Amino acid sequence: MANFKGHALPGTFFLLFGLWWSIKCPFRQILRRKERQVGDRERQKLTALFNRIDLIEGSLKIFFAFVGIMAEQFVPDGPHAHLYQDGWVKLMNWQHSTMYLFYGISGIADVLSVSSHHVPVGLDRLFLSLALFVEGFLFYFHIHNREPLDQHIHSLLLFAVFGGSASTMMEVFKRENAVLELLRCTLAILQGTWFYQIGFVLYPLSGPEWDLTRHDNIMFITMCFCWHLAVALLIVGICYCGVFWTSKWCERRQRGDMEMGLRKSTSTDSSSQKALLQESDEE
């Protein structure tokens, strides 16, 4: 959709997944460390928990992709599933629908990776990397013959898209790497906020319209992209620290409850021993 809503919709999807990954990835790293300290039964419970989370995530990805395709195709000015009718019909909407299609395929790969043992390890990351590559490939040929600022602001998005595709592809070969996972989180959030920025620049909700040919605006937008990256890094850092400190607090509380229980049992044992000694003295 060539309007603000058309950019806010994918921006919201990427923001939600980026924020979710920023919480899930450090949480998963902490639980992985605990796996080495627990028995087989607890390890099986953690594996089942991870699989359930991944299954829900894949299902949500499929749902969001379906919503995106329906929104692109069946808005009032959309193509309504007509590709050619005396000429090409709304090719921009078709390109966006194709982008959502590959994210839906990525969601299917997520579900299959969890529900079937015959699926190769890393297939979920491979298809996510492919979906990101297709998005960047489509957007690269999406911006020709446009005003300079329009081309520039979309080309900046490609850094986040292709960067995310490359880092996710590396996860196929270096599974459960903390740095690569956090990089994926950062670039997903950057994509989400930058989609909103594109919408505000090209389709401002209020105030004067941007001059799409002025070089100063191009310079500002380039600097603004760096600010978005800094904010994305800050958000991921806050989420990581929040999960880490919450885990530490829960561990301290659990340890305190165990110590209190031990003290109670010790005091109960000592009081019962005293009672037995008193009874024996009386006898």
Curated annotation (Swiss-Prot):
Topology class, membrane: Multi-pass membrane protein
GO cellular component: membrane
Region (Disordered), start-end ranges: 261-283
Domain of life according to the entry: Eukaryota
Compositional bias per record (Polar residues), positions renumbered to this chain: 264-275
Predominant place of localization: membrane
Keyword Secreted: no
Keywords from the named record: Membrane, Transmembrane, Transmembrane helix
Cellular localisation: Membrane
Record-annotated membrane-spanning stretches: 7-27, 55-75, 99-119, 121-141, 153-173, 187-207, 218-238
Family affiliation: Belongs to the TMEM45 family.
Name used for this protein in its record: Transmembrane protein 45B
